[in-house]
Amino acid sequence: MSYQYGQGYSGPGGNAPQWQQPPRAPYAGGPAAGQYGSPYGSAPPGQQYGGGSPYGSYGQPGPRAPYGGGQAPGGPYGGYGQPQGGPYRQQGSAGNVPPGVNPEAYQWFSTVDSDQSGYINAKELKQALMNFNNSSFNDETCIMMLNMFDKTKSGRVDVFGFSALWTFLQQWRAAFQQFDRDRSGSINTNEMHQALSQMGYNLSPQFIQELVNRYSVRGGTGVLQLDRFIQVCTQLQSMTQAFREKDTGMTGNVRMSYEDFLSSAITRLM
């Protein structure tokens, strides 16, 4: 089943915004105004959140949560391109970039589209995406992101969808770098707690520990690579939106039937 994210987008309108949350977005993780019509599963929240409101109990940001950039560990594309020497080292030509498409994203599209079909599928996307430890992105995250920007629900994206996906990755990569305090190339439990707190989520350390353990690589050291960080944060945004839709009184509490809960989860996570 395709995700509901990103349906009806018109393509990105230029370069990725530099962590600047538009005034209209009233809560953590809201999309920039006019971007793809997606109420959840969007890029990370920006520097300016606007005023406060009663959503603090489950994801409302506090005022002015600062994010920053910084040099990514690893290769020049810091986690969303192949490392130097890999099969995608030579990028495609930047000529004839369609209007509204990021030129750098176009170069990557030209290279990643290995069958020259004019579309990128999940297999091609996975071949192009690397974590900071040079491991490939997991299948779940690749499919999730592809579906977010799959306008036609065909299991693939054209150059406009890829440009939007590329911008999405840029923004989440910057968030990952910001919260990777020890520059290890991964996010541990303490760093994840800081990240989610600054994004506006009021979650217990115990829950975050369980979250990290659940999504960390089996047999690993209890840390999140970039792919899992994106997956966790995106799904958390989605479920928070589902909760918010039911919380009409903005109290931080809702009553719903078991089937309603399952419907909300299935709609957003399948």
UniProtKB/Swiss-Prot annotation:
Q: Provide the residue intervals of the sequence repeats.
A: 22-30, 44-54, 62-70, 72-81, 83-91
Positions bound to Ca(2+) 2: D180, D182, S184, S186, E191
Q: Which GO terms describe its cellular component?
A: COPII vesicle coat; Cul3-RING ubiquitin ligase complex; endoplasmic reticulum
Q: Which InterPro entries match?
A: EF-hand-dom_pair, EF_Hand_1_Ca_BS, EF_hand_dom, Peflin/Sorcin_CaBP
SMART domains from the UniProt entry: EFh
- Where would you find the membrane-spanning parts of this chain? none
Tell me which Gene3D superfamilies the record gives.
EF-hand
Q: What does this protein do?
A: Calcium-binding protein that acts as an adapter that bridges unrelated proteins or stabilizes weak protein-protein complexes in response to calcium. Acts as a negative regulator of ER-Golgi transport.
Biological classification of the source: Eukaryota, Metazoa, Chordata, Craniata, Vertebrata
What membrane topology is annotated for this entry?
Answer: Peripheral membrane protein
Summarize the subunit comment: Heterodimer; heterodimerizes (via the EF-hand 5) with pdcd6.
**Biased composition, class Low complexity, residue ranges:** 26-47, 55-66
Residue span(s) of domain EF-hand: 100-135, 141-169, 170-202, 203-239, 240-269
Species of the source: Danio rerio
The gene for this chain is: pef1
Mind telling me which CDD domains this protein's record contains? EFh_PEF_peflin
Q: Which residues bind Ca(2+) 1?
A: D113, D115, S117, Y119, E124
Q: Where is the composition biased (Gly residues)?
A: 67-84
Q: Which UniProt keywords apply?
A: Calcium, Cytoplasm, Cytoplasmic vesicle, Endoplasmic reticulum, Membrane, Metal-binding, Repeat
Region described as Disordered: spans on this chain? 1-97
List where in the cell it is found.
Cytoplasm; Endoplasmic reticulum; Membrane; Cytoplasmic vesicle, COPII-coated vesicle membrane
Region span, 5 X 9 AA approximate tandem repeat of [AP]-P-G-G-P-Y-G-G-P-P: 22-91
Give any single GO term for biological process. neural crest formation
Protein name (database record): Peflin
Q: Which GO MF term does the entry hold, naming one?
A: ubiquitin-like ligase-substrate adaptor activity
